[in-house]
Amino acid sequence: SSTATDWMALAMGRYGYFDSVDGKYTYLIDDGTGYTDYLNAMKSYVEKTYTENGGTLHSVKATEWHRGVVTIAALGGDPASFGTYNGQPINLIADGSYNCKVKGGPGKQGINGWIWGLIALDTGMYEVPSDAAYQRELFIKEILKMQLTDGVDGNKYGGWVLGGYGSSSDVDITAMAIQALAPYYNDDTVYTYKNEISGDEVSKTVRQCVDEAFDRLGSMMNDKAGFTSWNTDNSESIAQVIVALTSVGIDPQKDSRFITSDG
C-alpha cells in the first residue's frame, strides 16, 4: 500500500459509467480476483504497520487512513473492519476520522486532514458515535472556517489553500474541499464559526460557501478551459474541478462559469 498504488487501485475500482436508461452502473474493469489480491496485500500492510507502530498508520498524517478507506471501499472491502490488531478488528474509519489516532487530531495535517477525514466518513455515510472525539459537524466547520477572503463577483470569501492560510485559493484544494462538503450542499443547516482568515464571525450554509468557491474556481480557469496548480497547467486540476462540479449535480458543459468565451 502506498500513495501511488492506492490511488491507482481506487481509480480501477471506480472505472466505469452510469447508464441513465437502465439505471445501472457498468464497470469497465471488473476483475474480482485482482481486487481481492490487492485488498489482501493492503490488509497485510495495515496489520504490519499497526504492529510496528503501536496501533497507528502514521504519527502525523491522518490521510494515510483516509486514503485507505476510500480505496478499500472502492474495491468492495470494509474499512470499518479491516484486519486485526491485538485480536481486535481494525476500524480505519474510527482511527483516521472520528477517533483519530494522530496526536492533535485530523487537523494536525492541516486542512487536508479535515477534508479527507470528512470524505472518508461519508464514503459509506458511517455513523459517528455520540461520544466520539471528533463529530461530523466539527469536520464541516473546520473546513468552512478556513475559507479564504479572495472572493470574486462581490463575494468576500473564495476557496481554500493547502496550508489553510494564505491569500490565494488553490484549485486542487478548493475542489477537494467542495467534494468533502458536497453531501451537505442541499442541507439548510446554518453553521456559525469564526473565520480564521478574516477573524469575522460567520453564519452560512454549506451551499453558500460552496457557491462562493465555485465562483472563485471559475475565475481561475484559463482561456483554454484549463487550470493551474503550483504554477503548472495539469489535467489533475481539471479533473478535480469536474468531480467537484458533478458532486453537487452541476454539469461542467452547461455552467457558464466554466465555459470559455469561444465555447
Locate predicted features:
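Buried hydrophobic core positions in alpha-solenoid tandem helical repeats
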Residues: 42, 46, 96-97, 139, ...
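Core helices of alpha-solenoid repeat scaffolds
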Residues: 35, 39, 85-94, 98-99, ...
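An alpha-helical repeat/solenoid feature that recognizes helix-turn-helix modules
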Residues: 1-22, 55-81, 103-136, 148-212, ...
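Internal amphipathic alpha-helical repeat/solenoid segments
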Residues: 1-4, 26, 32-59, 96-105
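...the same signal can extend to comparable exposed beta-sheet modules
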Residues: 25-38, 60-64, 80-95, 253-263
